[in-house]
Amino acid sequence: MALRMIFMGTPEFSVPILNALFDAGHQIVAVYSQPPRPAGRRGLDLTKSPVHQQAEKLGLPVLTPLNFKAQDDRDAFAAHQADVAVVVAYGLLLPEAILTGTRLGCYNGHASLLPRWRGAAPIQRAIMAGDVQTGMMVMKMDKGLDTGPVALTRRVTITPDMTAGELHDALSQIGAEAMVEAMAKLEAGDLPLTAQPEDGVVYATKIDKAETRINFSKPATQVHNDIRGLSPFPGAWFEADINGKLERIKVLSSQMAEVTDTANVPGTVLDDALTIACGLGAVRLVRLQKAGGKPLDAAEFLRGTPIGAGTVFASAKAGT
């Protein structure tokens, strides 16, 4: 037997989970995704979401309502007569009519160990906070923001230099395995639910643009966590004076560095390997990217953009 299923998701993160459920033989009667968005320099082209594109490759019908305020959209959802809806990074809070619009309800794949990091940016926030462990949880959705009871948990270790991009990929794959297992148990009538604890609630708010500018006045551990938590998107950055022109440089990866001289101004370049003094300690910039350029390792970057020891990056003075 297989479940009659609706899948709801939008970004690349959700695609492996859609694929896994399809390969598991479930009858996916509809895929819901965010509407196509303007793309290109002039915004004249409309780009379908990664889930939308993959669903079409699989031959699945796709619906892209802006929201579910219209009764017609709610009726269309109910008309699928689905057993269950699987929701993974769809991008909308679902109204009661959708949460109760299938026989068994809506199950969500969320990229954190709830109740820590409820909300929009759990992967980035976990790394930026210096967490050493996170995970993927399958929960039954209710009206709250990631507050529903948990059905299944898979844990992942966050290594010291792991970026948000690397963690994203790991959780996406583990999430696919977890969701297939959860749906098999649900189909068998053996998927117990456990209420989330009331203590330990932390919200993963969206990343603000102001957070992406590196503040070297922070301790090196926090600078390092910010860099890897914002990599590859939206990217942590600083400004440097290159041949008399202030240029924005994105840092895609870094490492903690050992320093003996702790009296340097934060933001000071300490050597020819792009070791940068911080408020406490130092970080080494490993991979960088200029605006409009390609990502480069530090040595290759310095060959085209010489930055000497003693340079003080402008972002250290920004107070952000």
Swiss-Prot record:
Catalytic activity of the protein: L-methionyl-tRNA(fMet) + (6R)-10-formyltetrahydrofolate = N-formyl-L-methionyl-tRNA(fMet) + (6S)-5,6,7,8-tetrahydrofolate + H(+)
Q: Which GO terms describe its cellular component?
A: cytosol
Segments forming a coiled coil: none
Q: Which residues bind (6S)-5,6,7,8-tetrahydrofolate?
A: 112-115
Query: Domain of life, per the record?
Result: Bacteria
Cite the CDD domains for this sequence: FMT_core_Met-tRNA-FMT_N, Met_tRNA_FMT_C
* Statement: the UniProt record of this protein carries the keyword Phosphoprotein: no
The keyword Transferase is assigned to this record: yes
Annotated Gene Ontology MF terms?
methionyl-tRNA formyltransferase activity
Q: Which Pfam families match?
A: Formyl_trans_C, Formyl_trans_N
EC assignment: the record states 2.1.2.9
What are the UniProt keywords, alphabetically?
Protein biosynthesis, Transferase
Q: Which family does it belong to?
A: Belongs to the Fmt family.
HAMAP family assigned: Formyl_trans
Record function comment:
Attaches a formyl group to the free amino group of methionyl-tRNA(fMet). The formyl group appears to play a dual role in the initiator identity of N-formylmethionyl-tRNA by promoting its recognition by IF2 and preventing the misappropriation of this tRNA by the elongation apparatus.
Q: What is this protein called?
A: Methionyl-tRNA formyltransferase
